[in-house]
């Protein structure tokens, strides 16, 4: 897709024909359906595939594959066929393949949308740990509020344009306006709204669940 106007910069580089190869090497992508990304006969082979294409020396490649699988908790499955894994395990392998390439940026395109709630939360936590350990930029394209809550910055897209740029707290404080953006209202924001209607006083429209728990205890102690 070509830009209509202006310039695009990624990690300080302007995107053009001369820089596109270097920029591609800076980015790893994990898609919604991991089955569409698997090419190796085993988990280990699949994680190594991109490294082989780049001509990474064998010893370094083996070390990277081992480290990436350890990071996502899939070392014990190195010799398994990807097709025999669960949905959550497949996504972990796909993320390991991206991490092994040592990108500066990882793009997650609805990467947790096909998982059950437990698998989704586990994968989100894994991504957070990887981000913190490697200081990577993670761009997550998602409708999942748990993912949004862990982000530093949220860009809301509406009809192909940036509707807003804010912190998760600022976004969630918009209450029922979120529904018009195709998003759900967080549980804590819903509960605060209900409690306000019943006469309880809150200074915020949104709190994290831990903050809400603390404030509810304060309200109960005052009652």
Kindly label every feature range from the protein language model.
Residues 178-223:
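ABC ATPase nucleotide-binding domains
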Residues 81-85, 89:
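Conserved ABC ATPase signature
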Residues 59-77:
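Conserved ABC ATPase "signature" region
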Residues 3-14, 23:
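Conserved ABC transporter NBD signature motif
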Residues 102:
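Conserved catalytic motifs of ABC-family nucleotide-binding domains
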Residues 106-109:
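Catalytic Walker B motif of ABC-type/P-loop ATPase nucleotide-binding domains
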């Amino acid at each position: 897709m070509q830009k209509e106007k202006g310039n695009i910069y990624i990690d300080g580089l302007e995107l053009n024909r001369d820089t596109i190869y270097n920029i591609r090497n800076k980015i790893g992508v994990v898609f919604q359906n991991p089955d569409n990304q698997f090419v190796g006969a085993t988990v280990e082979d699949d994680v190594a595939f991109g490294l082989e294409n780049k001509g990474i020396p064998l010893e370094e490649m083996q070390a990277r594959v081992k480290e990436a699988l350890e990071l996502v908790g899939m070392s014990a499955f190195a010799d398994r066929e990807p097709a025999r894994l669960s949905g959550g395990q497949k996504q972990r392998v796909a993320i390991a393949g991206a991490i092994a390439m040592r990108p500066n940026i990882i793009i997650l395109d609805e990467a947790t949308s096909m998982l059950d709630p437990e698998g989704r939360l586990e994968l989100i936590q894994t991504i957070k740990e990887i981000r913190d350990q490697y200081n990577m930029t993670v761009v997550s394209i998602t409708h999942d509020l748990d993912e949004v809550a862990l982000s530093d910055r949220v860009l809301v897209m509406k009809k192909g344009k940036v509707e807003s740029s804010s912190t998760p707290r600022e976004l969630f404080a918009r209450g029922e306006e979120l529904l018009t953006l195709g998003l759900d209202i967080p549980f804590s924001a819903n509960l605060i709204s209900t409690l306000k209607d019943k006469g309880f006083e809150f200074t915020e429209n949104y709190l994290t669940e831990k903050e809400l728990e603390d404030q509810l205890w304060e309200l109960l102690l005052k009652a």
